[in-house]
Amino acid sequence: MAVETPSKIHNLIEEPIQQSLIRMTMPMIIGMIMLFTFSLVDTWFISFLGTESLTAISFTFPVTFTVMSMAIGLGIGASAVVASYLGASEPDKAKESATVINYISFGMACMIVLLCWTFMDRIFTLMGASDQLMVPIREYMNIWFPGSVLIVCIMTGNSILRAIGDTKTPSILMASAGFINAVLDPLLIFGLGPFPELGMQGAAWSTIIAWLIGFCYLTHLLIFRVEMVSKTLPSRSVFISAGKKMLRIGIPAAGANMMTPLAAGIMTAIAASFGGTIVAAFGVGARIEPIATLLVLAMSSSLPPLISQNFGAQRLDRVEEAYRLSIKFILGWQLIIYFILFLSSGFIAAIFSDDPEVIESIELFIWIMPLGYGLQGIIILTNSSLNAMHKPISALYLSIARFFVFYVPLAYLGSLYFGLYGFFCGAVCGNLLMGIISYRTFNEAIATEIRLDKSAA
């Protein structure tokens, strides 16, 4: 029997899985390109200010990505709850949950940002930033931190749109914001025309202005056009109930996502032991990675709504099929990406620096690290699938194991015995081991759900 859904909501329970994945992933690719080119464009323009400025912006990446990861995690919780209600044919509860989730995301963003801002100097000092580097770092982060609340709200709102099967609108929104950022960057960094020359601060202001415009548009869209967020605050009982469900998934998911920048911070500290030029090279490599794993990241946003709606409708066969199809495709795709990066490594390195040591280190990064991107894809898609199945603790355990049992420890051991080469190779080995563990974990989870479903029938 067909499941009835409102006209603005895509039915992901009956649409062919491959068709759903293609329809939802293609727009996400555009959105992801623009999202991650925010930092890449900033890095490129800032590189013209000199190696010191490039090194400073490289230090900010783990911290800025921590806030972004929290936003993504809360968005995962939002998407899982809303999509499950839609799959169970309860659109009213989906709207109530979406409304509550927006308020909670704003409140949590304010708390996390205030905490990070308060301990900013201590955080960057622990990462290995010198007193000299702290000057440009403060210039950038004192503007970026208060404005970052906007991106958390944008991420949550976009997740609600994806939960109803709409990945096109979030992609257009992020593409527009990315374009605005790219236009404003040279104007505010270098003071072109009537604009003031703000240097590092100009890059931060460009990003904040782009986010503000995107936030205003998205808020109007969710309330008045899509009508997935209510204009009035829900009752206390609804607020508590919906909030608990979202936070039960959102907090572990945010925690799991925040492992990534935390690990990146540790990896940056290890890179700092090789010298400032290596930090600059590692920072460039860290910004290339999201572009190289673009399809993985796009599918990590398009796959969960498909899984959540089918999980809510107890279509476990479709959940399993969607996961396996995604994994097979990602492994083949990332192999192609590796060869493209390998062949163009010299050209890519020369774009970001004219320092021979920095160029050599960027090339070494590109020759080794992308070998693990397909395996990293298995880990990311497994985590997003487990969250979509309302198993956030399993996803959190996998993230902890990946970063603090395999990825960072093996990279550190490699750096001790084989220098920079061992540092990169150790990280790839960590991804290999965790890719195997992640795949087995999903198989066990779906097998358990199938057994429970059969016993309940």
Where are these regions (language model features)?
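Transmembrane helical elements of multi-pass membrane transporters/channels
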Residues: R23-S39, I143, A177, A210-G214, ...
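Short runs within selected transmembrane alpha-helices of multi-pass transporters and secretion channels
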Residues: G75, W144-R162, P170-G178, A203-L218, ...
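Small-residue-rich hydrophobic transmembrane alpha-helices
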Residues: L54-L114, I151-P170, T268, A281-F339, ...
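Structural signal for membrane-spanning alpha-helices in multi-pass inner-membrane proteins
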Residues: C116, S159, D185, I189, ...
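Helix-terminus/linker motif at the lipid-water interface of multi-pass membrane proteins
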Residues: I33, T37-T55, F124-D131, L187-L198, ...
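Residue-level signal for short hydrophobic patches within transmembrane helices
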Residues: E14, Q18-T37, V41, V63-M70, ...
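Short alpha-helical transmembrane segments in multi-pass integral membrane proteins
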Residues: M1-T25, V82-V149, F195-I251, I307-G372, ...
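Hydrophobic transmembrane alpha-helices of multi-pass small-molecule transporters
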Residues: T66-S69, N181-P186, F215-T219, I291-L294, ...
